[in-house]
Amino acid sequence: MENVEVITKYDKTDFGEVWYVNAVDKSFRFALYKYDDDADTIYLSNVFVKKDKRGQGYGNVILNSAEKAAKKMGASTICLKVKNGSFAHQWYARHGYTDFTNDEEDPSYIWMKKEIM
């Protein structure tokens, strides 16, 4: 995988802060959320890797970047939500994320977390 240029957009919201990260070539994107009332946790969301780029290490780049950014922000945990039993669920588990609760709004989704400090 070649080096990929990214564009990062920051937004301060009523509930906290959001960082949107998009590859210039549109090969991947993700977002990180930090809520004002939970400074120890970063939420990884909206993860997408373009179909023709899958299996080339982009997912690892996203996780490594997210975990590094979370540490810089002083967080000790990253949380994310995935479809229970999906490929993504298994993939995150292989990368050290553990299930910790079902999603109350949609029980077909599960919350996962990883301690990063």
Predicted regions and their residues:
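Conserved beta-strand-loop-alpha-helix junction that forms the acyl-donor binding cleft
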Residues: 80-89, 104-109
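Conserved acetyl-CoA-binding loop of GNAT-fold acetyltransferases
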Residues: 93-102
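Conserved GNAT acetyl-CoA-binding A-motif
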Residues: 70-83
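Acetyl-CoA-dependent GNAT
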Residues: 1-45, 50, 69, 105
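A general lysine-centric signal
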Residues: 34, 113-114
